[in-house]
Amino acid sequence: PYVRCPADIRMLAGQSVAVPSGLGPDILIAPGVLFDEPDELPDVMRGEEIQIAGALLQNPAWAARSCMLLPGTHSKWAQIEDGRIVRYASYLTGELFAVLSQHSILGRLMPAATEKPRETDEAAFELGLSVARDSRPGDLSHQIFGTRTLGLTGRLPAASLADYLSGLLI
């Protein structure tokens, strides 16, 4: 079962289930959080609520009012007010990145994931963030294609395209 928004750590703890581990202390399973407003798409989170609780415990000032980005396969943008998760939205950020970089024309310009690890190009990532921030509604598909043209024209080196795309999608 999910705890409905607005949700706080007490509600999550109260709905957690203890499962015997067989190795000592029980394992607590948190219930997850449901955002379900009548005029909006429903949304669920499982696990990220624990990350939010930990962040609020480490940074108590954030509990008053903050917006948290939880990057990942299904990134979350969560609005926090008075220590409660009041709303959030999930995005297929990581999954979309994987599809675009591994199964589309964009990936042909990027170094293979099997190559040695490289340094993150923070400037390319920040460029992707700023292009997305300054965009108009409906521009995302054009911006994604721009990843290809930035590589083709040499405005970004191939090794930086993944970082640009990541910034664009986040």
For each predicted feature, which ranges?
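Alpha-helix capping and helix-coil boundary motifs
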Residues: 8, 116-121, 136, 153, ...
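Generic structural signal for well-ordered, non-membrane alpha-helical segments
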Residues: 12-14, 48, 89, 93, ...
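Short glycine-rich phosphate-binding loop at a beta-alpha junction
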Residues: 1, 72, 170
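Glycine-rich phosphate-binding loop and adjoining helix at the ATP-binding site
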Residues: 1-55
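Adenine-nucleotide phosphate-binding core of ATP-dependent small-molecule kinases
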Residues: 133-169
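Glycine-rich phosphate-binding loop plus the immediately following alpha-helix
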Residues: 31-132
